[in-house]
Amino acid sequence: MTTTSSIFSKFKAKKNKIKNVDLYFTPSKPIEAPTHLKGRDNEVEHILDTLTTDGKHCMIYGERGIGKSSLALSTLEGGKREGVLPSDIFVVRCDKKTKFKDIIARPAIFIDSEYAANKRETTKKAGVGLNVLKLFRTDVSAEEKIIIEKEDLTPSKACFALEELNAILLIDEFDVVSDDVKHDVAEFVKQLSDSNSPLKILLVGISSDGASLIAGHPSVNRCLHEIQLSRIEDKYLH
């Protein structure tokens, strides 16, 4: 049986053989120690393979209480630790009130250096919510700020603002959001794929099929790899 640590090392060696690139890893506080992966070697490799393939994104679904979130978090932490995944990982846990703009806000704020430097003062002045997100792109000057109205944040605008970000956005408990939000996220995934963005999306949710998690979006299937998680075999529980 492959050990928890060796599967990441094995995958790293495999990727290094395929493409000789400089991999980097910036240590930070772990999201989740990769200790929940016993018996999940195949799923871990599928996730890693998908998230390191150009234009591909990933979705984990299955019944409640089988370890979907733990698998996602532990795989991302292990992959980051070994340098096969980006060092910047954003985790959004949804609830019934979560909107598309809420999901996009975390990575958007991360790339907005001006907002990050003044977020306390800005938030205080703006009250409960900000009217705009000021997003910077590396290919435009500081004066050419892209202003995105939060109430009119479309998938195409979000993709344009974030497509150069080398990171992973984990959207957990995705099943509870509205169909409109699911459709917007699916369209966002498609546009990221079309633009060959290094920003990767990992969706996690309770479902018996992948289609319901993306509200039946017709053209996202080609770029969204589905992993249906089943209950772990008894032999791995002891």
Locations of regions flagged by a protein language model:
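C-terminal alpha-helical "lid" subdomain
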Residues: 2-7, 154-157, 163, 238
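Surface-exposed beta-strand-to-loop junctions
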Residues: 27, 84-86, 218-219
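The catalytic "switch" region of P-loop NTPases
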Residues: 6-9, 168, 180-238
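Short, solvent-exposed beta-strand edge segments and adjacent coil->beta transition regions
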Residues: 32, 87-89, 224
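A short, basic N-terminal segment
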Residues: 1-58, 77-81
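P-loop NTPase nucleotide-binding core
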Residues: 49-183, 197-200, 205-209
